[in-house]
């Protein structure tokens, strides 16, 4: 059972996938956003490649727990994905995952250019790993 993690932003979508046992998350790629149709096609291609049964999308919430414009954008894209996807889609509170990803990359002494290229993929990995840790308990 593979699970896909998504960090959906306005310009890119970070993608991570679980190992077959659902224990660990690995970053896969960063999709450059285009339009809903092409975004969905790109996500579905990865789902088919890895045999994904569940998608976990990071839900950006405000610090007070409300959902703002970014959260609405995530919900809208997931509604489009749902039309093509046979599995289930779940949301995961992604507050501070990008901050954690930046911190980890700074500690690894990655250049600014390298950080910019992989931050969304790393954030997707954090989102998915958090979800995997929760369901394994």
UniProtKB/Swiss-Prot annotation:
UniProt key word Cytoplasm: yes
Localization (cell): Cytoplasm
Keywords: Cytoplasm, Hydrolase, Nuclease, Ribosome biogenesis
Superkingdom of the organism of origin: Bacteria
Cited InterPro entries: RNaseH-like_sf, YqgF, YqgF/RNaseH-like_dom, YqgF/RNaseH-like_dom_sf
MF annotations from Gene Ontology: nuclease activity
E.C. numbers: 3.1.-.-
S-S bonds: none
CDD domains membership: YqgF
GO annotation (BP), single: rRNA 5'-end processing
SMART domains: YqgFc
Presence of keyword Hydrolase: yes
Pfam families assigned: RuvX (PF03652)
GO CC field: cytosol
Signal peptide positions (record): none
Known function: Could be a nuclease involved in processing of the 5'-end of pre-16S rRNA.
PANTHER family noted in UniProt: POLYNUCLEOTIDYL TRANSFERASE, RIBONUCLEASE H-LIKE SUPERFAMILY PROTEIN
Annotated family: Belongs to the YqgF nuclease family.
Name recorded for this polypeptide: Putative pre-16S rRNA nuclease
Biological source species: Clostridium perfringens (strain 13 / Type A)
Origin organism lineage: Bacteria, Bacillati, Bacillota, Clostridia, Eubacteriales
